Amino acid sequence: MAAFATGHSLGITGQEMNLGLKNYQQIPQRNEQIHYEGMTLINDTYNANPQSMREALKTLKEINTQGKRFFIIGDMLELGPLSEPAHHELGQEIAGSNVDYLVTVGPLASLAAESAKANAQQQLEIGRFATHTEAANYLLRKVRKGDCLLVKGSRGSKMENVVQEFLKPKKQSN
């Protein structure tokens, strides 16, 4: 409503605003929701830092799902001396959440897995992988109808490759 009021104050007609909303296109890799075969995949692979990882975890915690919650993370890069502590802190936050599966790709993300495992307050299955393909294959074995997956990592960790590898068999079978 505030957006319409702002548009109106700028002289934009209601018809123009409706047309703009109708033509809106989601920006790829930024909280992009993909629904297929009864599952939801949130592709938030454009970039990552400690705050955006916390927000992604919050999104996953709050999303309405009938199934399991999968948090698939890559390394948070370019944090300098804060890198290891940031990954350990993320793991602690994951441990206190309602995430069912933590899947990591990369050596720094693996630190988050270690911390999550050490601090888990409920059943948390953890998969640590060196490659995107290994992570995607793990997901293909574990994910079921009703599950929600959120994939996130720094640009340099190329977590979009996990999304592509995971969706590839689905696209070929359709």
Predicted regions and their residues:
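ATP-dependent carboxylate-amine ligase
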Residues: A2-N174
